[in-house]
Curated annotation (Swiss-Prot):
The gene is virB3. Transcription of the operon is maximal in early exponential phase. This is Type IV secretion system protein virB3. The keyword Transmembrane applies. It holds the Pfam family VirB3. One of its GO terms (cellular component) is plasma membrane. The keyword Kinase does not apply.
Length: 116
């Protein structure tokens, strides 16, 4: 006759979580820089060089080197900087402009119908 196993340690019981495979979350990189920030910065410099002067075009090399240094320790750094800009610098909510604060909740608030 078998019995239910005794749980000696409460931490080991239950859900332990799923493993995160770091390779699946890594952004596509070119020259050691994530592709999306590289395209945005490179495209901006190319547009400026067409509108202003072709002498601006060589600025791509040092800017890519600086971007490579930024992502050398953390490949998600530009994503984190973008999220910081989105949530701290750009206030899409009205209370952010007035109270200088923001609160984000995973709950979707819907209009409730009044019961009469």
């Amino acid at each position: 006759m078998t019995t239910a196993p005794q749980e000696s340690n409460a931490r080991s019981a239950g859900y332990r979580g799923d493993p995160i495979f770091k390779g699946c979350t890594r952004p596509a990189m070119l020259f050691g820089v994530p592709v999306i920030p590289l395209v945005i910065v490179g495209g901006s410099i190319v547009l400026l060089s067409v509108w202003i002067s072709m002498f601006i075009l060589p600025l791509i090399v040092p800017i890519v080197l600086v971007m490579r240094q930024i992502t050398q320790t953390d490949d998600q750094m530009f994503r984190l900087l973008g999220l910081k800009a989105q949530f701290r610098l750009i206030h899409f909510n009205r209370t952010g402009r007035f109270w200088r604060a923001s609160a984000y909740s995973p709950i979707a608030f819907t209009k409730r119908k009044r019961e009469s």
